[in-house]
């Protein structure tokens, strides 16, 4: 760099890249015979960030897991529901394959495959959606359909769902457009009859109408902060056609609708198939036979059902499945409490009889896997309260009587350190 002197008394330093003097910039960083200013450093960072953004999609394309890999990952965290896992694995794989290869393939437009999960409370609907998002490393948000209303009414706008998704990825629109949205309690926004409503139904059919475009694909204008309260803010444009929507609900009573259709279709008179009570299909078997007409009778509008072409049904969890859930998944409940006790230096053992008792209680409460934590928490509350103040506890043992509230956990004490030292 050519030296430039000022008044012949000292050097005036210049940035080797943009030519600005040390007085025109905030900072000038010196290297071997060269200088760079803070403005040029910022510019270099911007260039590198743009390069990374361009490279990222190519990395993602090669990293898309196959349906088998998705299913295997779900097996690590979700017990049972084999058919639902297979349906989800294929639907999710096809959705992200569509995103990474464009919406068309050889001139054929690829449709959007949103998913409807039907199953009782605590059967694993939410966990399946969360696990998928974690595997694919995409933003994930949950919404409760019962809190949603049409725009202009008291309650949450459907656009707030997209705002929550943006919050999860620091308002990065590109990331949000690859995200997963799970809308729970979707059965609660069914209309009261399968005939069009005469009066305004702002939290039922009205919400279904409001969700239609969002789920199918539209460019939603979402303010970065707040919904209706800050209309003056600059809106973010989010293309929802690239977002995977998974809707879930218990659909209590849907089995009766299906049963009526199946029995009506089996014939009447001399040609009718006579079934004994023992031949009646279980709720899970009936739900597996669900058709769009059943969902319409239940109260979903035809247009809304059309936006959810992939339907997966989940069975009510058996007692054996609940015991597996307690001990087998990577983040099993017993493993979580054992990790908590390990932080206090205490080993925690759950005997098989205790696991049986927990599962029986959950079955009696009809809460599925969701009720397991509250049962274990209640049984261990006093111990977790006292343990940090206790010394020399080495192990805790949980048996059936602890779960039934008849006794406290058996605590096994070790020798105090002073005694151990003197005994040696």
UniProtKB/Swiss-Prot annotation:
SUPFAM superfamilies: Glucocorticoid receptor-like (DNA-binding domain), P-loop containing nucleoside triphosphate hydrolases. CDD domains: RecA-like_ClpX. GO terms for cellular component: HslUV protease complex. The keyword Zinc applies. ATP binds at residues 120-127. One of its GO terms (biological process) is proteolysis involved in protein catabolic process. It comes from the Bacteria. The keyword Amino-acid biosynthesis does not apply. Residues 2-56 form the ClpX-type ZB domain. GO terms for molecular function: ATP binding; ATP hydrolysis activity; ATP-dependent protein folding chaperone; protein dimerization activity; unfolded protein binding; zinc ion binding. Belongs to the ClpX chaperone family. ATP-dependent specificity component of the Clp protease. It directs the protease to specific substrates. Can perform chaperone functions in the absence of ClpP. Component of the ClpX-ClpP complex. Forms a hexameric ring that, in the presence of ATP, binds to fourteen ClpP subunits assembled into a disk-like structure with a central cavity, resembling the structure of eukaryotic proteasomes. This is ATP-dependent Clp protease ATP-binding subunit ClpX. It comes from Shigella boydii serotype 4 (strain Sb227). The gene is clpX.
